[in-house]
Design a protein with these regions (language model features):
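Bacterial N-terminal signal peptides that target proteins for export
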Residues: 1-8
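Amphipathic, charged alpha-helical segments and their helix-to-coil junctions
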Residues: 33, 44, 69-141, 145-149, ...
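Post-signal peptide N-terminal segment of mature Sec-exported envelope proteins
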Residues: 24-53
Length: 198
């Protein structure tokens, strides 16, 4: 009886050790880098100047030291490793087409609407009319077209990376990126709904 109990305990311990959970997490740093490249491509190629002092270097990583107990545990239980710096794919035929349409709009009338303060960026990665009366009638559809492309872009990036559930995080990352890359004088609406001038 004692041997059976000991055997069951040992088998349960081995079974518990064998249970490994691998978390698929949102790669924030890779998403920020990808968003910055996409946004830079749209704004820079359409003639929008980069903000002064806008150095977008990623913060340095802390040194990764291992505790001795972790090294011993790694000897006993093989570790499952995920990619150290996962990649976010933002290039696909769909996103390339969206990028070109966005560049054309920014190279055309949309930049003028931002410069005049008639429109601004929102906290959810879209464009909103700040002063609808300042938007000429023939340009009012630009905001709707831009937002349709932005919604499609965020969904396409999440889908291209095999994680549709990341769409909200991708949207937030891009929303922050649009505001950071915006030139001085452009408006943005923060999470509370208040308009602010950069």
């Amino acid at each position: 009886m004692r041997k059976l109990l000991t055997s069951l305990i040992v088998m349960a311990a081995i079974a518990l050790v064998g249970c490994v959970t691998i978390n698929v997490y949102f790669p924030e740093a890779a998403a920020q880098k990808a968003a910055d490249q996409f946004i830079g491509n749209v704004l820079d190629d359409s003639g929008v100047a980069r903000p002064a002092g806008g150095s977008s270097t990623a913060p340095a990583r802390p040194a990764s030291g291992k505790q001795p107990s972790a090294a011993v545990l790694d000897l006993l239980i093989p570790a499952a490793y995920a990619a150290e710096s996962p990649d976010i794919q933002v290039r696909s035929p769909e996103t390339d087409a969206i990028r070109e349409r966005m560049k054309n709009r920014f190279g055309g009338a949309l930049k003028g609407l931002f410069d005049s303060g008639a429109v601004g960026f929102t906290a959810d990665g879209l464009v909103a009319a700040r002063d609808p009366g300042a938007i000429p009638l023939d340009q009012r559809s630009l905001v709707d077209q831009e937002n349709a492309d932005r919604n499609a872009l965020y969904a396409a990036i999440a889908k291209a990376n095999g994680h549709p559930e990341w769409e909200g995080q991708i949207r937030k990352t891009f929303a922050d990126g649009w505001v950071q890359r915006a030139p001085s004088g452009w408006y943005y609406r923060d999470a509370s709904g208040a308009w602010k001038r950069k």
